[in-house]
């Protein structure tokens, strides 16, 4: 079972992850130790930047990061959910989804499918017998 770790400033990301059926959901600032692979869901701040709290968390635990999703607001144009682009590039992980504000039911469905895909792919790498 994969854990979803999220960072939320206004509550949009928390509302999004709470709509999913994932059982193990933890917030970045309430996570004192991570020792299993995880998917990160974060927000975008200022003009397309990764939040400082997310960046600090990743400095310690990026080696366990499987993929990233991000929230944003489409009024920011090219900076919409840009934190996902930055994290993906910096840590060489896939962008699983970008969603506006707290997302729609379709966003939750697409995110869930992508998480399942990346977890399956990761499991196959760890257990090459499959």
Swiss-Prot record:
Role: Probably involved in ribonucleotide reductase function.
Q: What is this protein called?
A: Protein NrdI
- Name any one Pfam family assigned in the record: Flavodoxin_NdrI
Q: Enumerate the InterPro entries for this protein.
A: Flavoprotein-like_sf (IPR029039), RNR_Ib_NrdI_bac (IPR020852), RNR_NrdI (IPR004465)
Family recorded in the similarity comment: Belongs to the NrdI family.
Q: Which SUPFAM superfamilies match?
A: Flavoproteins
User: What is one Gene Ontology biological process annotated in the Swiss-Prot or TrEMBL record?
Assistant: protein modification process
Q: Which PANTHER family match?
A: PROTEIN NRDI
Q: Which GO terms describe its molecular function?
A: FMN binding
Organism of origin:
Bacillus velezensis (strain DSM 23117 / BGSC 10A6 / LMG 26770 / FZB42)
The organism's place on the tree of life at top rank: Bacteria
């Amino acid at each position: 079972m994969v854990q979803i770790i999220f960072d939320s400033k206004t509550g949009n990301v928390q509302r999004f992850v709470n709509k999913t059926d994932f059982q193990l959901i933890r917030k970045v600032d309430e996570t004192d130790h991570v020792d299993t692979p995880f998917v990160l869901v974060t927000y975008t701040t200022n003009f397309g930047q990764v939040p400082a709290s997310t960046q600090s968390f990743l400095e310690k635990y990026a080696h366990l990061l499987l993929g990233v999703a991000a929230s944003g607001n489409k009024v920011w144009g090219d900076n919409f959910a840009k934190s996902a682009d930055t994290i993906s590039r910096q840590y060489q992980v896939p962008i699983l989804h970008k969603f506006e504000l707290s997302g729609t039911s379709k966003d939750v469905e697409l995110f869930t499918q992508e998480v399942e895909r990346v977890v399956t792919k990761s499991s196959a790498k760890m257990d090459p017998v499959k």
